[in-house]
Amino acid sequence: MVTIGSHGSWQPGRGPMTTWTASPASREIMARAESDPMPPSFQQEQHLRTAYNAKALGRNVPRLIMAAWDVDGWCDVAAMTDAINLHIRRHDTYHSAFDVTADAITRRTIDNADRIEFIPTSLGFMEEDEIRHHVLTATPGTLEWDCFTFGVIQKADSFTVYANIDHLHTDGTSAGLIYQDIHLTYQGLVAGRPASLPQTSSYRDFAAHQRDQVEATTLDSRPIKDWVDFARETDGDWPSFPVELGDTSISTAGGVVTVELLNDDQTQAFNNACRAAGARFSGGVMACAALADHQFTGAETYHSFTPSDTRSGDAQSMSAGWYASLFPVSVPVGDGDFAQMSRAAQKSFDANKHLSAIPFRRVLDLASPEELGVTLASQPSMMVSLMDFRALAAADANHLGIYLDNLSHGGINTWIIRHADQTTVTVSFPDTAEGRHSVHNYIAVLRGIFAEAAEPNADWADEVADHAFAHSA
């Protein structure tokens, strides 16, 4: 399966290390690049603002997403250099730098991507701890253009490749695309048959379309009304972790834990239960999250944020960049019946997915919280993401892993991941004593709920059968 973990859990082994970073000439070209009137995407803008404010406070915040995989044999450095540079030149998210001040964010863009060059540097033999430390500390910060680096660790009969990318230019889907891009290109080059890669789309064009779409909204637009309805419904109780995490203001240290929720047979049974209830896998996941929240809080309605991959079309689906954006889901608990909750969750999921195109910040640009009659969040948020890695099953042979830096924003991110042969949950959390205890307690409850949903009792089965009959009539 595709591994999800922290940089600290990554096991690249020990051996000679080679890294790829921007050449001095490329940095100079970017420093002299002309100003580009196109603002960053809304995802990038928020990330840049967070990085700017964190730098002023002397704090580190989560930012790095690393894809790593293994390749048999001895690395051909020249071929890997070509593969990495082709990847960077293919995806224009890497072609812009952002100058951030307290008042503005200005983009600068290189007009000829062929002038960008990443060059290899041999660092010699390094131990595993040294490698992890280097990868975490040597990638330039979010406010620097070249906040993405690559590397290889050579072993006796194989090597490990990594691409360590700031979130400014990547998301969960991008991690898989980066692996496919570089790995397929490299394999083609060493075999003497250059890979035929699919067409990509411009991330800059995505940002332009996003700006036009958002700025066209008014208080009478459906997305704005739907966001306001959700905010009013929460009544200040915005999506957050249901268990205490301790004092998260002292440190931004974070942890990541991954455990199995369902084995292969249970995953199939869970999917069948969702379908029989008139929902999909995503509706069942949200129903289970709602039941877990209810066990801790007793809340009658569960509110959550979940990300949507806003890529559209074949070319954009193959493009690296930060396309993922959050939208809200609300699930009434009722009497706790999984089938009913799955249908309600699916209905909310499908009805609100369009809100991923419009950030909630747009609502506040149009009116104040007082004018809208809403109460804003007072604690760090919680996200529940559903990811489907079945399409990456072939990457199992290369031990593909996605690794996050050991930092936390103070809230909780949860990824429910469907693999070819199991379902796992990964949670990133503030690394406090209370946080560690609470997260492990939460996961234990969540595992029990998923397992129970995969083995419905007779009453539940009767209810599903009745619904299925009525639905087919």
List the model feature ranges, each with a label.
Residues 1-56, 81-124, 146, 200-255, ...:
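Short amphipathic alpha-helices and their capping loops
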Residues 2-12, 123-126, 142-144, 148-205, ...:
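Active-site-proximal acidic secondary-structure segment that organizes catalysis
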Residues 98-100, 152-156, 416-420:
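Short, low-complexity Ser/Thr-rich regulatory SLiMs
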Residues 97, 186-201, 228-239, 438-473:
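A short N-terminal helical cap/helix-turn-helix that marks the beginning
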Residues 1-50, 54-63, 293-358, 372-453, ...:
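Acyl-thioester-dependent acyl-group transfer interface
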Residues 77-88, 136, 179, 183, ...:
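Short amphipathic alpha-helical segments
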Residues 24-37, 59-79, 143-163, 246-311, ...:
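Gly/Ser/Thr-rich phosphate-binding loops and adjoining beta-strand/alpha-helix segments
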